[in-house]
Amino acid sequence: MLVHGYPDNSEVWHEVAPLLARDYYVIAYDVRGAGRSSSPKGMRNYTFARLTDDFIAVIDALSPGKPVHLIAHDWGSIQSWEFVTEARLRGRIASYTSCSGPCLDHVGHWMRARLLRPTPSSLGKMLGQLVRSWYVLLFHLPIVPELSWRLWLGRAWPRVLRRVEKTAIVPRATQTADGVRGVSLYRANFIRSLFTPRKRVAHAPVQVIVPTLDKYVSPALSEDLSRWVPQYWRREVVARHWLPVTHAARLAEMARELIEHAEGKPESEALQRARQHGDRKPLCGKLAVITGAGSGIGRCAALEFAEQGAAIVAVDIRAEDAERTAKLIRLTGGKAWAHTVDVGNAEQMEALVDWVGKELGGADIVVNNAGIGMAGGIVDTSERDWQRILHVNVWGVIHGARLFAKQMVARGQGGHILNTASAAAFAPSRDLAAYATTKAAVLMLSECMRGELAGQGIGVSAICPGFAETGIMASTVYTGTTEAQQAQLRARATKLYQLRGLKPETVAKAMFSAVQHNKPVVTIGIEAHSSRFISRYAQWLSRLIARVSMAGH
């Protein structure tokens, strides 16, 4: 059952309906006052009670013996909340997928809670929604909205949507009438619901799809509905308000997942992560794929993101290390999978991305962290050494960033990619020719990707830690040295890093902060901050420092 919003009619579902009709009997109707339905005069004829009677009449006629799966948008979604919380309809709605239309009673309680216990954050969210709802005040003015529709807006509506919403629609013969008559929906229901809200609890499974670029409905309105919805899923899509028109296939796919689950199939991994509970952690419902997760920064990032609510795919070239990380997460109550991959191998990375997409529904966060250390000058670094470090430090990041970014764009749900660079990206060094080169490449790649993917709702961060105690020094290759010399240099470097005391847990927390605040470049440690400062404002000093050998060989 498809219920349209304002100022639309059932034609808004012309892209969605055929996709669902492959497997289901699809019903779409014009609500009263829209399309070919009757338009009774008087505001009292547009109350929720009358709209509910209409809905019952439709399902009595077309699905009298079987509950319907409800999908609604905008004002159709607002009134459908009435249906899914109405005692008369208990058992007649099998599931409800809502898009861009909250329950007005829930909004009333939401506003009360923020006024009674105000905080800067809660008041900011409430004021943000009030600004988005400017048109509601306009619709309560006498005559003005009706005149606007009759004089110009009815004819101009397709052009207005194209300019303001970047959404193309086909002009409709009933557009002016739909706009004029539908104003009564606001006048008959808004004030009563917001100022004297009822306690409305859903009696069917509910999935709320949130277009993150919606100019009219804030994502904050759907953040905490577990009080009202015992079975609740929440999913975000990087899209504007008119999702049935612009992202019909994605909307149909998400609705289908809930329908299939309501009909008895197990939850898909993506749907399972979207299930909401009372105590919601910041990354609840997100899937994070982390390379180099078997030790050091990668393992700490996996544990930190899991602690914040994310499900984890721990990726490492060593199977036992990846499994150890996954096991640690499971022991703390998290969800994790282990995967063995050589990140520099394109085919293996493609297989990983394909598996994540098909089995888990796609990644929300990707941490391209796998890397190796290498010290030595350009003269001592052989072609084989270059091939090895480029394979992991550069190609590993390129494969992970490119392939997962492509998946994120196709999903349309945004995401975040973190690429682990280093303080060495800012500081030329005679002792770190190959390593610093690869990390500078990662930094520039991250900056380029950030510019490219911003419009898709995908953030990209370059993580640049200083001398973190990760164990990388114990495996660093010192070019141009004997095995005995390498052992001495590794032991010396490891001791220095331990004395520095920058823990990988600190880097992991900085990674989480980068995701939360969409930071472009994250420097961790005084040496990272100072190297970045010098590279910007004292390049002569940076070049002078580059001449100093710190390797002692």
What are these regions (language model features)?
Residues 27, 34-71, 77-231:
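Flexible "cap/lid" subdomain of the alpha/beta-hydrolase fold that forms the substrate-access gate
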Residues 1-36:
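Conserved HGGG/HGGXW glycine-rich cap/lid loop of the alpha/beta-hydrolase fold
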Residues 401, 438:
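Active-site helix of classical SDR
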Residues 13, 377-378, 385-387:
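Substrate-binding pocket helix/loop in short-chain dehydrogenase/reductase
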Residues 455-526:
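SDR active-site lid
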Residues 422:
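Residue(s) in the substrate-gating loop at a strand-loop-helix junction
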Residues 287, 294-295:
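Conserved glycine-rich cofactor-binding loop
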